[in-house]
UniProtKB/Swiss-Prot annotation:
GO cellular component, one term: membrane
Superkingdom: Eukaryota
Keywords: Membrane, Transmembrane, Transmembrane helix
Leader peptide range in chain numbering: none
Family: Belongs to the TMEM205 family.
Protein's membrane topology: Multi-pass membrane protein
Record localization: Membrane
Transmembrane segments: 18-38, 53-73, 81-101, 166-186
Official protein name in the record: Transmembrane protein 205
Amino acid sequence: MEKGEDPGSLIKVIHLLVLSGAWGMQVWVTFISGFLLFRSLPRHTFGLVQSKVFPVYFHVSLGCAFINLCILAPQRAWIHLTLWEVSQLSLLLLSLTLATINARWLEARTTAVMRALQSIEKERGLGTEVPGNFQGPDPYRQLRDKDPKYSALRRKFYHYHGLSSLCNLGCLLSNGLCLVGLALGLRSL
């Protein structure tokens, strides 16, 4: 497209719907549903639910970032891009990269380690309780202190889970900043 040419109302609406839908989904999964489920479900049931939700969630995030990049990238000749347009493309590329890392690499590894942890926990009669309902010493801490294999698996799980959380927060922040930029560019409400 030539500099300054309007991409059309439909493209603008699709871009806004995909971007805001992705961001809303990310806010829900990151800050609301996970905490509600964690406090309401037995530990292993929570893990099972998350292992089913996260692959879909990460792939939808990846798809939304890809769609938005495909919409935005061809809108202007690259030489005519403003600083904001370059920033927005960079943020969407970052979101696509982080969502891809989560969807294609981290999620499968995190789930595999979680299943190995749950197998050991089941052998010890753990995993059917809702977190935070312990009376007395924490049985998971005791298991971690007594079983080096379990302790190593927990470290590995938290490593993958931490990286996945950072990638997810990066996607959320990238999409949020893109939405802020779009909102600041509105002429009226």
